[in-house]
C-alpha cells in the first residue's frame, strides 16, 4: 500500500500553478510522472502523490523540473482564473476511478495519434525520397538519351560525309574510265587509218607490177578486233549455319538435360508478363519493365534506401514472378531491415526458381543459401543456418568468407565462441 504524500506546497497566478513536491530521498530514476488536463500523479515508491485538479490545464505545455530532492511542476491553466484549491473537493472513490480511467484513455489516444502522425511522416519521407530518386533517374536517363542523340547526329553526319566522299570518288573514277576509253578509241582510229594507208599503197604497187589484162585483186584483208567489256559476274548466295549455345562443360560431366531445361525456364521467365495490374496505367513505359525496376531497386539498395528498393522489387515481381533474382535481391533488403522471416521466404522462393542446379545459376544459388542461413542464425536457429552454409560451400568450396562464417556457426552450436 503506497504512502500518500501530503507535505507539498503550491502557488498560483491567473495563468499558472507552481507545485513543489519533495521526493523524500527516493532516487530520480524510480520516479514516474503521469499528467493529463484534469489529473496529476507522481509515483516514487513507496510514496504516491495524486491530484484531481480543480480546473483543466494545458498538459502539453506544462513542465516538470527535478532537482535538490524536489520536483517542481509548472502547470499552465487553460482558463485564466484563480483556483480555490489545488484538488477538487467532495470527490468520492468512484468519481476518482472514473477520472483516472478517463485520463489513461486520453493518454493512450494521444500516444496513438502521435504514433500515427510519426508513421504518416515516415511514409511521406519515404514517398519524397522515392520521388527524388525517380527524378534523379529521369534526369540521368534524359541526359543519356541526349548524349545518344548527339552521338547519333554525329554518326549520321559522318556517314553522310563518307557517302559524299565515296560518290565524288566514284565520279572521279568514272571520268578517268571515260577518258581512258576515249584515248583507246582514238588509238584504234589512228591504227585503222595507218592500216588503210598501208593497204592502199600495197594495192597501187601490185597494180603497177601486174601484167595487162589481168585483174588485180587485193590480197590484203585486215580484221580489227575491238576490245570487249567482260560480262558482269553471276549472283551467288552463301549459307551460314549458326552453332547452338552450349555450356562449357566436359562431356563426361555434362548435364545436358538440366542445362537445356534451365535455358528453357529462363526464356519462359523473360516472356512471362502480368499486365493486368491497375497501377500500370499510371506508370511510364520503362517503369513497366521488370528489368528496369530490378536495376532501380539495385541502385536504391546501394544508397541504403531499403524500403524504396523493396517497393521496386515488389512491383517487378507483380509484373513477372518467374525471375529468381528479384526474390534474391529482395531477401537482401529484408535482411538489412531485420525482416528475417520474409528474408527466409524470398530466399526459399529464389532457390525454387533456380532449379535445376547448373553451372550458370551456381553463384545465385550460393547467395540464396547464404542469405537464408544468415536469417536462420539471426533467429538463433543455428542448425538450420549451418545446413544452408554447408550447401553454399558445396557449390563454392573455395569461398573463404563462407568457410569462416560456417566455422563460427559450428562453434556456437558446440557452445564455444571462436576466438578472433
UniProtKB/Swiss-Prot annotation:
Stored PROSITE patterns: CS, TPR, TPR_REGION
Function text: Axonemal dynein assembly factor required for ciliary motility. Involved in neuronal migration during development of the cerebral neocortex. May regulate the stability and proteasomal degradation of the estrogen receptors that play an important role in neuronal differentiation, survival and plasticity.
One cellular component (GO) term of this entry: plasma membrane
Region (Mediates interaction with ESR1 and STUB1): 7-103
TPR repeat boundaries on the chain: 290-323, 324-357, 366-399
Record-linked Gene3D superfamilies: 2.60.40.790, Tetratricopeptide repeat domain (1.25.40.10)
Stored PANTHER family: DYNEIN ASSEMBLY FACTOR 4, AXONEMAL, DYNEIN AXONEMAL ASSEMBLY FACTOR 4
Lineage of the species this protein comes from: Eukaryota, Metazoa, Chordata, Craniata, Vertebrata
Any GO MF annotation of the entry: nuclear estrogen receptor binding
Cellular location(s): Nucleus; Cytoplasm; Dynein axonemal particle; Cell projection, Neuron projection
Keyword Nucleus: yes
Predominant location category: nucleus
Related illness: Dyslexia 1: A relatively common, complex cognitive disorder characterized by an impairment of reading performance despite adequate motivational, educational and intellectual opportunities. It is a multifactorial trait, with evidence for familial clustering and heritability.
Species assigned in the record: Homo sapiens (Human)
Residues of the CS domain: 3-87
Any matching Pfam family: CS
Subunit organization: Interacts with ZMYND10. Interacts with ESR1 and ESR2. Interacts with STUB1. Interacts with DNAAF2. Interacts with CCT3, CCT4, CCT5 and CCT8. Interacts with DNAAF6/PIH1D3.
Tissue-specific expression: Expressed in several tissues, including brain, lung, kidney and testis. In brain localizes to a fraction of cortical neurons and white matter glial cells.
Any one of the GO BP annotations: learning or memory
Name of this chain's protein: Dynein axonemal assembly factor 4
Amino acid at each position: 500500500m503506497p504512502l500518500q504524500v501530503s507535505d507539498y506546497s503550491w502557488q498560483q497566478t491567473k495563468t499558472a500553478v507552481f507545485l513543489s513536491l519533495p521526493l523524500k530521498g527516493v532516487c530520480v530514476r524510480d520516479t514516474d510522472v503521469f499528467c493529463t488536463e484534469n489529473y496529476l500523479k507522481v509515483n516514487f515508491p513507496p510514496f504516491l502523490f495524486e491530484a484531481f485538479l480543480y480546473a483543466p490545464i494545458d498538459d502539453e505545455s506544462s513542465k516538470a523540473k527535478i532537482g535538490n530532492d524536489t520536483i517542481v511542476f509548472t502547470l499552465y491553466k487553460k482558463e485564466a482564473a484563480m483556483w480555490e484549491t489545488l484538488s477538487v473537493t467532495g470527490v468520492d472513490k468512484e468519481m476518482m476511478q472514473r477520472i483516472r480511467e478517463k485520463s489513461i484513455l486520453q493518454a493512450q489516444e494521444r500516444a496513438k495519434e502521435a504514433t500515427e502522425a510519426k508513421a504518416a511522416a515516415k511514409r511521406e519521407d519515404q514517398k519524397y525520397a522515392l520521388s527524388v530518386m525517380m527524378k534523379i533517374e529521369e534526369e540521368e536517363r534524359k541526359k543519356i538519351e541526349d548524349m545518344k542523340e548527339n552521338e547519333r547526329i554525329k554518326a549520321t553526319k559522318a556517314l553522310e560525309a563518307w557517302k559524299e566522299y565515296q560518290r565524288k570518288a566514284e565520279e572521279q573514277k568514272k571520268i578517268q574510265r571515260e577518258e581512258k576509253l576515249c584515248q583507246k578509241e582514238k588509238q584504234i582510229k589512228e591504227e585503222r587509218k595507218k592500216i588503210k594507208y598501208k593497204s592502199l599503197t600495197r594495192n597501187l604497187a601490185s597494180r603497177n607490177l601486174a601484167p595487162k589484162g589481168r585483174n588485180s585483186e587485193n590480197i590484203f584483208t585486215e580484221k580489227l578486233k575491238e576490245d570487249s567489256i567482260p560480262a558482269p559476274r553471276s549472283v551467288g548466295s552463301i549459307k551460314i549455319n549458326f552453332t547452338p549455345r552450349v555450356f562449357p562443360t566436359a562431356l563426361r560431366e555434362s548435364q545436358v538435360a538440366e542445362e537445356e531445361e534451365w535455358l528453357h525456364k529462363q526464356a519462359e521467365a523473360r516472356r512471362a508478363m502480368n499486365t493486368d495490374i491497375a497501377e500500370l496505367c499510371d506508370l511510364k513505359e520503362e517503369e513497366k519493365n521488370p528489368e528496369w525496376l530490378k536495376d532501380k531497386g539495385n541502385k536504391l539498395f546501394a544508397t541504403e534506401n531499403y524500403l524504396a528498393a523493396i517497393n521496386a522489387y515488389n512491383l517487378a515481381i507483380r509484373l513477372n514472378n518467374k525471375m529468381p533474382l528479384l526474390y534474391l535481391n529482395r531477401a537482401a533488403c529484408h535482411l538489412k531491415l531485420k525482416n528475417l522471416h520474409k528474408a527466409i521466404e524470398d530466399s526459399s522462393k529464389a532457390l525454387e526458381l533456380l532449379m535445376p542446379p547448373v553451372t550458370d545459376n551456381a553463384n545465385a544459388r550460393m547467395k540464396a543459401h547464404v542469405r537464408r542461413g544468415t536469417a536462420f542464425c539471426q533467429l538463433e536457429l543455428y542448425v538450420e543456418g549451418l545446413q544452408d552454409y554447408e550447401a553454399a560451400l558445396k557449390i563454392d568450396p573455395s569461398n573463404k568468407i563462407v568457410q569462416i562464417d560456417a566455422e563460427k556457426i559450428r562453434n556456437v552450436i558446440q557452445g564455444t565462441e571462436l576466438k578472433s
